[in-house]
Amino acid sequence: MKRWAIASDPRTWVDAHLHLWNSSLLAPPWLAQAPHFAGKFDVSRYQREGGAAQSMVLIEADVAVADREREAQLLDAWAQETVVASTRECAIVAAIEPNRVSFASELAAMKRIPRVRGSRRVLHAGEIEFGTRGFAQDMQSLSAQGMSFDFCVRWSDLAKVDQLACELAPMTIIVDHLGNPPLRAGWNSPQAQQWQRLIARVASNGNTCVKWSAMFENAGGALSLAQARPWFEWCLACFGAQRVLWGSNWPVCFAHASLVEWIELSATLAGELTATEQDQILRGAACATYRM
């Protein structure tokens, strides 16, 4: 790969994976186990901690089922404030859960919020019912409404994502966080080799994208360029720049590293690519995927 070492300005990027919440208004249940994430994490704080993206995709934060619509409304209100205060554009990925009794009402409620462009569920904490007819049917309903779906799964479950992506083409399927690879095991580990095969299978479906995000979280801390590069370059080779989306995963990823460190590492790796590839990864792919 030819290395150009010219990084684009982070102020021109689209952050395709940003979480916002104010726990005094609505507290995700998992904050009980992560009290350091209690408080107000809004656009102003994101900017103070180094976030400078031109536009943003606001991602649901695994709130309680009863709070999902309220969360989307709060995200939409914050998005409106951001749009009014700056030239930034925002899209929302809301919590809409396939194969749940309340799915139809959740989908109808989210469709009333124009900035909602897709849905996501955190599925790495439990069993994924990909094989059920209800799950597939509800995914088809999402697709019929023009919704994409973000999968946040364990890397060992990527084969299920591959199967579903094949069945549901042309629905847009986004794999969050490079498929949560086994970074702690190391690039030369048997686990990494399994991840390589699985993420390549997912990428073979033309309706899939991958988010370049959460590497520090999966590693348990900041990474060096040498540690991060092979995982990024593998996904780039599998998906192509037009299907790789950069995201911060702020603030979730930064208990042991900073947002600035992630932006600097990302800028250096992206800076090794052509200007066209940089534009696709850092802006264009997110705009196309989330219709921004």
Summary of predicted features, one role per range:
Residues 13-23, 175-178:
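Histidine-centered catalytic micro-motifs
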Residues 10-12, 52-57, 86-91, 113-117, ...:
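Short, well-ordered coil/turn segments that N-cap beta-strands
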Residues 69-157, 163, 211-218:
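Active-site gating/metal-coordination segments in enzymes
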Residues 1-14, 25, 31-32, 37-55, ...:
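Mid-to-C-terminal alpha-helical segments outside catalytic/metal-binding sites
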Residues 17, 56, 92, 119, ...:
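Conserved, mostly hydrophobic/aromatic
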Residues 131-245:
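Catalytic pocket-lining loop regions of alpha/beta-barrel enzymes
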Residues 32-87:
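Alpha-helical scaffold segments that flank or form the walls of functional sites
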Residues 21-24, 63-66, 99-102, 126-127, ...:
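Active-site environment of divalent metal-dependent phosphoester hydrolases
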